[in-house]
C-alpha cells in the first residue's frame, strides 16, 4: 500500500493495472514515462515518491473518456467536481480522474487529488507534489517539442524556475491555438514568477 496515512486503498501496482485497462497503448506509455519522471523529481526534491508515483499513474486515467461521460461524472458528483464543467474542455480529464479516484478507487489523499486535478492547468499555491506532477507531464520521455530538453535540465536544478518557464510555454501554446485559457494557469504563473524572484 502507499505510505501510511496517505489516504489510499490503492497500491502503485493496482494503479498501473487500472490505467493499463483504461488507456490506449500510446497514452499508457506516456503515463509510465510521467511516473518515472515524477519519481525522479520526488527523489531530487524530497517529496513522497510513492505519492508521486500514484498521482502520476492516475493523472490521465480519465483522458480517453468521452466528453459526455465526463460531464455526467461532474453532474453526479457536483460538490467534489468543483465546477469543472465550466472550465475549458481540455482540462476536464484531471477533474474527472480526481472524482473517480474518490468515488470508485479509494484514493482520498488531498495532495494526490490536487496534483491530479491541476496537472494540466497548474493553480495558485501549488504544493511540491502539484509542481512535480505538472512538470513530469510536461517533460516525460516521449515529449519532443521545442524547449523540452532545456526544461528537463532546468527542472533538476530549480523546480520553480522550470515551472515558470513551462507555464509560459503552455500559455503561449493555448493562445496560439486560439483556445480559452484556464484562469488557474494565469494564477499559477503569477505564483511561479513570484517564487523565482524571492
Summary of predicted features, one role per range:
Residues 30:
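N-terminal glycine-rich anion-binding loops that anchor highly charged ligand groups
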Residues 159, 163-177:
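Long, amphipathic alpha-helical surface segments
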Amino acid at each position: 500500500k502507499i505510505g501510511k496515512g496517505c489516504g489510499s486503498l490503492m497500491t502503485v501496482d493496482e494503479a498501473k493495472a487500472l490505467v493499463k485497462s483504461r488507456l490506449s497503448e500510446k497514452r499508457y506509455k506516456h503515463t509510465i514515462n510521467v511516473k518515472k519522471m515524477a519519481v525522479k523529481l520526488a527523489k531530487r526534491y524530497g517529496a513522497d515518491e510513492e505519492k508521486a508515483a500514484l498521482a502520476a499513474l492516475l493523472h490521465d486515467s480519465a483522458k480517453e473518456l468521452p466528453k459526455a461521460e465526463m460531464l455526467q461524472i461532474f453532474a453526479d458528483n457536483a460538490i467534489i467536481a468543483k465546477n469543472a464543467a465550466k472550465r475549458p474542455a481540455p482540462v476536464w480529464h484531471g477533474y474527472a480522474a480526481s472524482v473517480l479516484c474518490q468515488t470508485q478507487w479509494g484514493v482520498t489523499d488531498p495532495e494526490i487529488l490536487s496534483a491530479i486535478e491541476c496537472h494540466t492547468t497548474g493553480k495558485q499555491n501549488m504544493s511540491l507534489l502539484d509542481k512535480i506532477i505538472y512538470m513530469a507531464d510536461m517533460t516525460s520521455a516521449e515529449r519532443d517539442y521545442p524547449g523540452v530538453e532545456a526544461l528537463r535540465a532546468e527542472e533538476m536544478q530549480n523546480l520553480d524556475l522550470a515551472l515558470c518557464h513551462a507555464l509560459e510555454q503552455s500559455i503561449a501554446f493555448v493562445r496560439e491555438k486560439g483556445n480559452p485559457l484556464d484562469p488557474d494557469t494565469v494564477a499559477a504563473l503569477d505564483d511561479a514568477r513570484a517564487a523565482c524572484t524571492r
